[in-house]
Design a protein with these regions (language model features):
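Rhodanese-like catalytic fold shared by cysteine-dependent sulfurtransferases
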Residues: 1-23, 27-146, 150-281, 285-391, ...
């Protein structure tokens, strides 16, 4: 019988204050994680742990503390982590309840540390903002105004402020000069809620942009609650060839230096990467398209705005070292200035030449070896489904499943496998799939153990089924368990209730007080 080490909540909090490396891992599904978690907890659901852990926690000797809320998932996760080579793995004593009983603060939503930091920035710097009504009046006045949307382009396409241009947050300091006709032109920065517009606005102010800059207070949520109309499916983007002036680059570099961002050479980077007792993340903060066209060997794509907004998703080891790179001297500096203020040891790689960006494409995820499995092709499966006795189990995301799936398939997660199988009619054999069948492969022995029936793996996954031109079904009729794999964000999509949007804003406004109660954040706003 396995034995487990335990770490107390008080010890975790002290390690955070001491800036020692640690990863505090919540292995529940994202929707459960979003109900309550410690500030620096990272969500690595047991159901897809294999796909993410090596990217997010690359060093095998990092101290890992795993918890759930009494579901029994943490113990399974520890066994798997040990089997993959992680050497310092422990359970959080009494799990989430133990953290709460010890007096630890609990946060809701996702990316809570980044969002709380953004609210602290506004509180300290008094970041200027305008209400939805004030921005609408500015538009109606026919005065020249530039509205930039700091979210990802796909979010911008879903809904946007009329007349706005997509400029993801990490690109703002580099691109905004090319979008403003004069230094007097007002610039409005928006996101869906509050935090990305706060950081985007303050980034431009910190970069010394001469234009009057304001955040759209409460973003598209505030715009909607004011009864104003959003645009949809817009395509306006910045010119990717646009660059900032030399003066702007110098201003940004100076601010990054003030924040504590070091400038290092390749030799220093290599020395850091060879240290066995420290984690060094190397992130390329340019756009995903630029990264795919050519990037520095070993770097990971992390567009600057997303890295600041979703730091826990990219760098899941608090206390680790973060090195950033770009090819312009601005994006890494402005991104690094925020990470340094968030308490990360941050550096940027000195100017790189095009020849050094020698790797192409997006590297495949590093995952543990998958179990052996009998495979079945899409055409063979289609023939097999013509006769009774075969049930298809789909381990993709619930959103993907609802959008399209193999007719008759059931959706489930590995963390709720036993419960799901009880809800699914028994079969003579099972076929498992997901988008590519990468994740589904790990489920083969688990399904076999619980059912005692033959289990096959769909070669190439549902994508191969689609490529073969085979029929597809849509909708949620095949959900074997509740959709808990993704938290429904009140700031995404166009069908959120006014009550949910207002509650989200009120939660954001309360984050600064939560930070004060928590006391472990280490944030320092310049």
């Amino acid at each position: 019988m396995s034995t487990y080490a335990y770490r107390q909540a008080a010890g975790i909090r002290q390690a955070l204050l001491d800036r020692r490396e640690l990863a505090l891992i919540d292995v529940r599904e994202e929707a459960d994680f979003a109900t309550a978690h410690p500030l620096f907890a990272v969500n690595l659901p047991l159901s897809k742990l294999e796909l993410e852990v090596r990217r997010r926690i690359p060093r095998f000797t990092t101290p890992l503390t795993v918890y759930d809320n009494g579901e029994g998932l943490a113990e399974i996760a520890i066994e798997r982590l040990r089997s993959w080579g992680y050497q310092d793995v422990a359970l959080l004593a009494e799990g989430l309840a133990g953290w709460r009983r010890s007096g630890g603060e609990l946060f809701q939503d996702v990316n809570s540390a980044s969002k709380a930091f953004s609210e602290l920035v506004e509180s300290v710097r008094h970041t200027p903002s305008l209400s939805a009504q004030e921005v609408q009046a500015l538009i109606d006045s026919r005065q020249e105004v530039v509205i930039v949307d700091a979210r990802r382009f796909d979010e911008y396409q879903t809904m946007s402020i009329p007349g706005s241009i997509s400029v993801p947050g990490g690109e703002l300091a580099l691109r905004v000069e090319s979008l403003t006709p004069s230094p007097q032109t007002p610039v409005i920065v928006n996101c869906a809620g509050r935090t990305r517009s706060i950081i985007g606005t303050q980034s431009l102010i910190n970069a010394g942009v001469p234009n009057p800059v304001h955040a759209l207070r409460n973003g598209t949520i505030g715009w909607t609650l004011a009864g104003q109309t959003l645009a949809h499916q817009q395509q306006r983007q910045y010119d990717p060839s646009a660059r900032a002036s030399g003066a702007r680059a110098a201003e940004v570099a100076h601010f990054a230096e003030r924040a504590g961002v070091a400038v290092i050479d390749e030799a220093t980077l290599q020395r850091w990467q060879q240290q066995s007792d420290r984690t060094t993340f190397l992130f390329d903060v340019r756009s995903p398209e630029e990264y795919a066209a050519g990037h520095y060997p070993g770097s990971l794509s992390a567009p600057g705005g997303q890295l600041v907004q979703e730091t826990d998703h990219f760098a899941s080891v608090r206390g680790a070292r973060i090195v950033l790179l770009d090819d312009d001297g601005i994006r890494a500096a402005i991104t690094g200035s925020w990470l340094a203020q968030m308490g990360w040891e941050t550096a940027r790689l000195s100017a790189l030449s095009t020849s050094q960006l020698s790797e192409r494409g997006v590297p495949a995820a590093e995952v543990p070896p998958g179990p052996q499995a009998e495979e079945i092709s899409p055409t063979q499966l289609a023939q097999q489904l013509e006769e009774p006795g075969t049930v298809v189990l789909d381990f993709t995301t619930s959103a993907n499943f609802v959008a399209r799936h193999i007719p008759g398939a059931w959706w489930l997660t590995r963390s709720q496998l036993r419960q799901a199988l009880e809800a699914i009619p028994p079969a003579q054999r099972y076929v498992v799939t997901c988008g590519s069948s990468l994740l589904a492969r790990y489920a083969v022995p688990e399904v076999a153990a619980l059912t005692g029936k033959p289990v096959q793996l769909l070669t190439g996954g549902t994508l191969a089924w689609i490529a073969a031109g085979l029929p597809l079904a849509h909708g949620d009729s095949g959900l074997a368990v509740e959709r808990r794999d993704r938290y429904r964000r009140p700031y995404e999509g166009t069908d959120n209730s006014a009550q949910a949007m207002q509650a989200y804003l009120e939660w954001e406004y309360g984050l600064v007080d939560q930070l004060a109660r928590d006391g472990t954040h280490g944030f320092r706003v310049l």
